[in-house]
């Protein structure tokens, strides 16, 4: 029997870039900090995919999204990104190419979801996206494949009071649905700016620190 293939996915999140590359957030130059994290990622073997889970820009400027792509992209490595509460989704759309396409790595389906709610810091996965996701999970179940889910807002309370008031409002509903499907193995998110790990049923929930934390 052939050995199973291991895939590497690099996640960037909450870079909070601005139109001005010299801009700082809480005393940190966000462009410089993103470059430092990207350089660290690039010091390892090339990944199979790069996923960016929102709040890539702090001001929603087109320049900030192009700079983000320039800093994190690697030759011939697929990039997928999605909006957070600080992002301008329409501007992101103008700056994206293949980033909107589904991503498949062997038996793994990497699914990105938009949890942004316009005008709000809290997030939610809309009903249509949930219906579509359930269909994708059922299809993966049928052929014994796996799903990695990616979005911005935290679906679980983390203990950080100021973040737990602006979490994913339907996180419990989402996790209940995921645990009906054996293909659902993990989800990654940003938003909270710190590390978070928990297992809920068969789903590993991973929150990732901000590149400018």
What are the residue ranges of the model-derived segments?
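Active-site neighborhood of phospho(di)ester-bond hydrolases with catalytic His/Asp-centered motifs
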Residues: 11-13, 49-55, 79-85, 114, ...
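Beta-strand-turn-beta hairpins that frame and shape the catalytic cleft
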Residues: 2-11, 102-112, 137-148, 199-205
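His/acidic metal-ligating clusters that form di-metal
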Residues: 37-49, 123-204
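Short, electropositive alpha-helical surface patch
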Residues: 62-78, 165-175, 202-211
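Active-site HxH/HxHxD metal-binding segment of metal-dependent hydrolases
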Residues: 77-98, 157, 209-212
């Amino acid at each position: 029997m052939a050995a199973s293939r291991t895939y590497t996915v690099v996640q960037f999140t909450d870079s909070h870039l601005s139109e001005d590359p010299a801009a700082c957030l809480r005393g940190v130059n966000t462009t410089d900090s993103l470059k430092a994290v990207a350089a660290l990622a690039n010091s390892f073997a090339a990944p199979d995919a790069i996923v960016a889970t929102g709040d890539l820009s702090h001001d929603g400027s087109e320049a900030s999204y192009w700079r983000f792509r320039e800093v994190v992209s690697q030759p011939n490595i697929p990039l997928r990104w999605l909006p957070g509460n600080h992002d301008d989704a329409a501007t992101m759309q103008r700056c994206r190419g293949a980033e909107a396409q589904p991503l498949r790595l062997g038996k793994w389906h990497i699914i990105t979801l938009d949890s942004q709610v316009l005008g709000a810091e809290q997030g939610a996965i809309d009903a249509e996206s949930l219906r579509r996701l359930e269909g994708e999970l059922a299809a993966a179940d049928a052929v014994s494949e796996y799903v990695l889910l990616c979005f911005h807002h935290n679906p679980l309370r983390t203990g950080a009071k100021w973040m737990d008031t602006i979490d994913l409002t339907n996180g419990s509903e989402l996790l209940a649905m995921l645990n009906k499907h054996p293909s659902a193995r993990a989800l990654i998110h940003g938003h909270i700016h710190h590390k978070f790990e928990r297992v809920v049923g068969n789903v590993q929930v991973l929150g990732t620190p901000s590149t400018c934390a």
